[in-house]
């Protein structure tokens, strides 16, 4: 098919030190080869809830019918269990019927370079991004909600697409016979985010050394994902400041990186400060977890680097990463997706290695 994209933007400088800028874009992205043709694979992901587990289906005829429609044998009703490891089978894979995803984005911001402060420059930009027909997989929570919430029915495709172990009725077991939850890619997703980026840089000569200060910060106002954009009942899930199996990587409300560098004749000393705002477990699922697992406090990391310019063509760099040996907060193994919460500590966001050292050499010819 044919897709059209376009972009419009402009800038205005009311005074020499200030530039105001803005832009609007209509963009598209076609699915890649993997998204189209990846072979379906059944594996494991974290989740420790199953509406069909326990005695509930024995007293609820509709729930019993749903469990049976998902492939549970009649003899398993009342004895279905949740995996003791807190995991379920999930089937992921490509989709040859995927179409292009489409986004409308707009930004407005300013560039400030004051004549009264040589060496100082600042930019601030508000961004607003809405992605429709997003190439995404539903979250595990969304798959369960589509079936078991809002007048569930044993004939609802959202229910029958969940496939249980044909011997036990569980959602875990042999991957050859238990596809579990369908997480294949579709164009049903909708993603929205907005926030502010702030960048500031300052350079000056202190006499005994050169000083460079750099700052990059982000404030995220909203980061929402809707698994089915065409279903008014589909949850428009907010993930800013939250973590759970239903949110991807942790998105703090505020984060920044600040670097201070002192440059001497042949040595550069640099201290980098990384800040990650505090986050908490998604309110919709908070009660399922221990109190101590429901929050991760704000984190400050410091990295120290020294560059020795031995000659014009040879330099040595020594670094200490995570200078104060900060340890990540342990939050349990099943509170987030295995893609991001491997090892109970969200190593995709937080430093799980502790203080470490490196020495590198660079030679130019």
Segment roles from a protein language model:
Residues 26-76, 122, 128-168:
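A surface-exposed, glycine/aromatic-enriched loop/edge motif typical of exported proteins
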Residues 16-20, 117-122, 208-211, 266-270, ...:
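Repeated loop/turn-to-beta-strand initiation elements of outer-membrane beta-barrel proteins
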Residues 130-132, 221-224, 273-284, 307-365:
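C-terminal beta-signal and adjacent terminal beta-strands/loops
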Residues 121, 125-284:
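Gram-negative outer-membrane beta-barrel transporters
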Residues 8-12, 22, 108-112, 198-202, ...:
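Residues on the lipid-exposed face of transmembrane beta-strands in outer-membrane beta-barrel proteins
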Residues 2-4, 92, 102-106, 192-196, ...:
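Residues that define the transmembrane beta-barrel architecture of outer-membrane proteins
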Residues 1-61, 66-67, 91-107, 111-117, ...:
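Structural signature of Gram-negative outer-membrane beta-barrels, strongest in the C-terminal barrel
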Residues 24-30, 37-39, 104-106, 114, ...:
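Transmembrane beta-strands of outer-membrane beta-barrel pores
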């Amino acid at each position: 098919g044919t897709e059209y994209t376009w972009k419009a933007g402009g800038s205005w400088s009311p005074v020499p030190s200030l530039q105001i800028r803005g832009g609007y874009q209509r963009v598209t992205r076609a699915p890649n080869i993997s998204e189209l043709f990846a072979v379906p694979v059944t594996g494991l992901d974290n989740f420790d809830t199953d509406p069909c587990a326990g005695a509930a289906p024995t007293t609820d005829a509709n729930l019993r019918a749903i469990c049976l429609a998902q492939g549970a044998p009649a003899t398993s009703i009342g004895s279905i269990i949740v995996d003791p490891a807190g995991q379920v089978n999930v089937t992921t894979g490509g989709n040859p019927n995927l179409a292009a995803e489409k986004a409308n984005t707009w930004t407005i911001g300013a560039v400030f370079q004051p004549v009264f402060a040589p060496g100082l420059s600042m930019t601030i930009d508000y961004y607003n991004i809405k992605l429709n027909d997003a190439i995404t997989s539903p979250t595990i929570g969304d798959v369960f909600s589509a079936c078991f919430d809002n007048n569930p029915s044993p004939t609802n495709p959202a229910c029958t697409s969940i496939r249980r172990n044909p011997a036990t009725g569980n959602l875990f077991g042999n991957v050859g016979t238990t596809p579990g939850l369908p997480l294949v890619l579709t164009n049903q997703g909708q993603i929205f985010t907005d926030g502010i980026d702030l960048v500031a840089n300052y350079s000056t000569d202190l006499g005994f050394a050169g000083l460079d200060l750099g700052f990059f910060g982000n404030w995220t106002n909203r980061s929402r994902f809707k698994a089915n954009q065409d279903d008014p009942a589909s949850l428009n899930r907010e993930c800013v400041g939250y973590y759970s199996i239903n949110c991807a990587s942790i998105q703090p409300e505020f984060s920044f990186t600040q670097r201070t560098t002192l440059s001497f004749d042949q040595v550069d000393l640099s201290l980098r400060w990384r800040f990650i705002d505090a986050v908490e477990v998604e309110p919709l699922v908070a009660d399922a977890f221990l109190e101590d697992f429901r929050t991760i406090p704000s984190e400050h990391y410091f990295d120290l680097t020294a560059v020795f310019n031995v000659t014009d063509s040879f330099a040595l760099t020594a670094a200490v990463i995570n200078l104060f040996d900060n340890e990540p907060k342990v939050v349990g193994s099943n509170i987030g997706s295995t893609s991001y919460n491997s090892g109970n500590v969200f190593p995709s966001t937080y430093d799980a290695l502790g203080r470490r050292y490196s020495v590198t050499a660079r030679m130019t010819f």
